[in-house]
Amino acid sequence: MIHRNTFINAPLHLDDTLRLRRRPDLRLAGQITGVEGYVESAATGLIAARCLVAEEVGGVAFPPPPETALGGLVRHLTSSSSDTFQPSNITWGLMAPLPATASFRGRRERRQRHAELAVELARRWGETLPGHWV
């Protein structure tokens, strides 16, 4: 059996709410967007659905902050070079770095601080939709 990973060139075709640029009435999620992994595929579904709900209730659709795992994944899908785009799962490298003013000792402390910031930013992102639907 041969495994074939089929995906679109997401930076070329998707906006940051996972809509097709040429068909904004359609959103994509899952492996076809260029994510790898079950969690990542489900996460893109959550993001696409949340953005759709935000628009339907009269709000503004926007992706999670790039300092979060979900936001970093969206940023990878929509801001990578379309010439070299390849699927990815969530890694620390996808997330926007901590502010330059942040001080910490070592990788463990840096990741702990990043995780704390990401949780807070994700909470705030979730609260931007009426009913706090995350």
Question: Each predicted region: which residue ranges?
Answer:
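Non-catalytic terminal regions with compositionally biased, polar/charged low complexity
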Residues: 60-67, 126-131
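Generic hydrophobic secondary-structure packing signal
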Residues: 37, 41-44, 114, 118
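Predominant activation on well-ordered alpha-helical scaffold segments within soluble catalytic domains
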Residues: 43-50, 74, 119-123
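C-terminal auxiliary extensions adjacent to catalytic cores
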Residues: 88-134
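A glycine-rich dinucleotide-binding beta-alpha-beta segment and adjacent secondary-structure elements
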Residues: 1-35, 42-43, 62-79, 85-91, ...
